[in-house]
């Protein structure tokens, strides 16, 4: 078994239309070792552009995004990212925590699904799991 190669740093992009949540994530990430926040986006279009330029290891993604800028939501973005970047880790962080959203996101390839209100504290643990994950040697 070999560790995933994150070049010693996990590179993260956040996608959320709430400035408060984005700031909470930034604050949390700033306290973690080996995490580099590459940038944040509020809608799917700007997120795709940022992600294509930066190629993060991890995307922290909300379902509801800025509807004024795009007709794509976080699930649409999840599908697009999963098809283009199958190795990228995607953490869904949303207030839409009903089972049907969780099932859809997991079915479309999300690695984690967290409720913003109840599970925010789980983000560091998920990032740590990603950093220390092992995969079979090829």
Where is each model-derived feature located?
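Short amphipathic alpha-helix used as the core "switch/output" element in two-component signaling
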Residues: 70-86
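Non-catalytic signal-transmission and effector/linker regions of two-component phosphorelay proteins
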Residues: 1-11, 19-21, 121-138
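The short loop immediately C-terminal to the conserved phospho-acceptor aspartate in CheY-like receiver
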Residues: 64-69
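Alpha4 helix (beta4-alpha4-beta5 surface) of REC/receiver domains from two-component response regulators
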Residues: 72, 76, 97-114, 118
């Amino acid at each position: 078994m070999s560790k995933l190669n994150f070049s010693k740093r996990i590179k993260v992009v956040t996608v959320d239309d709430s400035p408060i949540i984005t700031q909470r994530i930034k604050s949390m990430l700033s306290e973690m070792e080996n995490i580099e926040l590459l940038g944040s986006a509020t809608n799917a279009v700007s997120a795709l552009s940022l992600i294509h330029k930066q190629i993060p290891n991890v995307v922290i993604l909300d379902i509801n995004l800025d509807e004024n800028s795009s007709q794509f939501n976080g699930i649409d973005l999840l599908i697009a990212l999963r098809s283009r970047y199958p190795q990228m880790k995607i953490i869904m962080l949303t207030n839409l925590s009903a089972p049907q959203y969780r099932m859809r996101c997991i079915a479309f390839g999300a690695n984690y699904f967290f409720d913003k209100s109840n599970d925010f504290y789980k983000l560091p643990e998920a990032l740590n799991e990603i950093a220390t994950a092992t995969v079979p040697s090829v």
